[in-house]
Amino acid sequence: ERLEALIAIEHDDHATAAAIRAADPPPWLRIIPAPPGGPRTKPRAMNHALDLARGEIVGIYDAEDRPDPGQIRRAAAIFAKAPPRLACLQARLAFHNTADGWLPRCFAIEYIQWFHLVLPAMRRMGFPIPLGGTSLFFRRRALERLGAWDAWNVTEDADLGLRLARAGYETGLVDSDTQEEAVSRPLAWIRQRSRWQKGYLHTWMTHMRRPVRLWRGLG
């Protein structure tokens, strides 16, 4: 096996590190604490982990994700047959806790239409794919060429999807599902969506600084 798994955590998250070690992880799994400093964000932690990763294909999962068992092999097989311009693959996201109430069920309906209808249509029409933040696979060379993730953007996935398209890369879709846990409380939903809107605004302001260049880059 050529699998390597890096768990990116903050440098002072001792409880998570202890829980992982107590679970007796396999030798191909390593804990990667982000160095002290800011911002304390997921993209900053991923940038640090990328520097220590050894693989040519880089996959991203959130801590609660439950991907299909064959998802990684399927993504690797697609990359092996595809031209280098295919730099990213997005798997579908779904939720395993729809029985927890009305809000998770609404999430599930939203994601079904997004991953089964909207993204495939955008792919067919040649539009940039707004990435989902998890269950993503990248060619490492393309990721490093673009400078990896923007550590200050809380929707680093949306920003990276646009940067991939502007650089001439393509994003494909993997016929595979990852089960996630949807937020089930209204306040948590408000915080999550507020963070997303903040990140989308950040992304829009970043890429619209030179709208003509953006238009030309996206073709």
Predicted regions and their residues:
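Hydrophobic targeting segments
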Residues: E1-I9, I31
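Acidic donor-binding loop at a coil-to-helix junction in glycosyltransferase catalytic cores
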Residues: V154-L160
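Long helical/loop segments within the catalytic core of UDP-sugar-dependent glycosyltransferases
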Residues: A22-G55, P69-V154, P186, I190, ...
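Catalytic donor-sugar/metal-binding loop of nucleotide-sugar-dependent glycosyltransferases
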Residues: G161-Q179
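Acidic metal-phosphate-binding loop of nucleotide-sugar-dependent transferases
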Residues: D13, Y61, D65-P67, L93
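A conserved acidic beta->alpha catalytic loop
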Residues: I9-A18, P36-P39, R66
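Short aromatic/hydrophobic "clamp" motif used to bind/position activated sugar donors
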Residues: V58
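A short, conserved beta-strand element in the Rossmann-like catalytic core
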Residues: R66-P67, A94-H96, D159, Q179-E180
